[in-house]
Amino acid sequence: MKFRPLHDRVVIRRAEGDTKSKGGIIIPDNAKEKPQEGEVIAVGPGARDENGALVPLDVKAGDLILFGKWSGTEVKIDGEDLLIMKEADIMGVIDKSVEAKKAA
């Protein structure tokens, strides 16, 4: 990727939404609910505190995260639809080991 976010901004690749309902009905693209989870692609260096010291971010590239429904700004970078948001808009990090245990 040729994009580096500034300050406490984070670049997110939104997770793919469900294409079928639980009852087996195929959901068209314009009726799909946008997923509120995604993967962190890139992070900025961090924000500055009152003293001017750099405060690093809690998330890192590769983290699976949960964010608010209206969080972030949709952008297209290198032909890919991504989100850019501040770290404060991220609600939490999803533990991949727990997800893997559920799938097994």
UniProtKB/Swiss-Prot annotation:
GO CC terms: cytoplasm
Q: Which GO terms describe its molecular function?
A: ATP binding; metal ion binding; protein folding chaperone; protein-folding chaperone binding; unfolded protein binding
Q: Name one GO biological process term.
A: chaperone cofactor-dependent protein refolding
The alphabetical list of record keywords is: Chaperone, Cytoplasm
The residue ranges crossing the membrane are: none
Instruction: Please name the Gene3D superfamilies in this protein's record.
Output: GroES chaperonin
Q: Which CDD domains match?
A: cpn10
InterPro entries the record matches: Chaperonin_GroES, Chaperonin_GroES_sf, Chaprnonin_Cpn10_CS, GroES-like_sf
Q: Where does this chain mainly localize?
A: cytoplasm
Reply yes or no: does the keyword RNA-binding apply: no
Record localization: Cytoplasm
Family indicated by similarity: Belongs to the GroES chaperonin family.
Q: What does this protein do?
A: Together with the chaperonin GroEL, plays an essential role in assisting protein folding. The GroEL-GroES system forms a nano-cage that allows encapsulation of the non-native substrate proteins and provides a physical environment optimized to promote and accelerate protein folding. GroES binds to the apical surface of the GroEL ring, thereby capping the opening of the GroEL channel.
Oligomer and partners: Heptamer of 7 subunits arranged in a ring. Interacts with the chaperonin GroEL.
Which HAMAP family is this protein grouped with?
CH10
Name of the protein this chain belongs to: Co-chaperonin GroES 1
Q: Which organism is it from?
A: Mesorhizobium japonicum (strain LMG 29417 / CECT 9101 / MAFF 303099) (Mesorhizobium loti (strain MAFF 303099))
- List the lineage, top down: Bacteria, Pseudomonadati, Pseudomonadota, Alphaproteobacteria, Hyphomicrobiales
